[in-house]
Amino acid sequence: MNCYDIAVIGGGVVGAEIARRLTDYSLKVALIEKCADVAEGGASKANSGIVHAGFDCHVGTLKAKVNVLGSKMYPELCERLGVELINCGALVVGREEDLPKIRTLYEQGIANGVEDLEIVGRDVIEKYLPTVHEDIKYALHAKTSSIISPYYATIAMAEEAALNGCEFFFNSKVEKIERKDGVYEITAGDNVICAKAVVNAAGAGSAEINKLVGAEEFPLRFARGEYMLLDQIGRAHV
């Protein structure tokens, strides 16, 4: 049986980064992933790749706190991993009647500790979006928003974790977790892995992992967005 200090369940961006950070210490770490590679089966393989500034999170929530902290951590992390981070900024645009909503987002961002946040008019908007519809009058400009390739980032995190000694178990869906003699015994595919501690980073499957150990149940709410690519003519009508 393979025995470790910590087993991380889930090979998305969260699981890969947790494993990478844990291998900075004198710990024997395993990462268990149900797919054939990291960033293959979950949200990390296909999302917008935005490193959010943190203005859209409710004030006082854990999400708001870690969002702003994470945004500040990414430049140094990407430099270390050799992953491109594009600090393009973000615009939340609106018509005249949307100005109160934009102000609310601004105030929320300031309360969350977001830096370089301002409300701008068409003169600034047109510098970034020259074909924007004439009805657009205002925008919230978040200069700290960036974009990144989520799968390249996940792969880079996992590669550094591997170089630091993390062991990976792919094609290994966790089916059972039992507490025996002070350790967790994890049955995953053809593998039985024991660990002193388990980190649940299974993303959309995290609630099911919790159920396997009888831990607190929590609801998951899923959302799916759509992105549209428009030609120059189409943009003018949005």
Language-model regions, residue ranges each:
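N-terminal Rossmann-like FAD-binding beta1-loop-alpha1 element of flavoenzymes
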Residues: Y4-L31
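Flavin-dependent oxidoreductases
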Residues: E17, I177-H237
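Glycine-rich FAD pyrophosphate-binding loop
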Residues: T23-K45
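Short loop/edge segments at beta-strand edges and connector loops
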Residues: E33, N87, V120-R122, F170-S172, ...
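Helical element adjacent to the flavin cofactor pocket in flavoenzyme catalytic cores
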Residues: L140-A197, A201, G205
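Dinucleotide-binding Rossmann-like beta1-alpha1 core, especially the glycine-rich loop
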Residues: S48-Y128, K137
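Short, flexible, mixed-charge acidic loops at enzyme active sites
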Residues: G42-G49, V132
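Conserved Rossmann-like nucleotide-cofactor binding loop
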Residues: V14, D37, G205
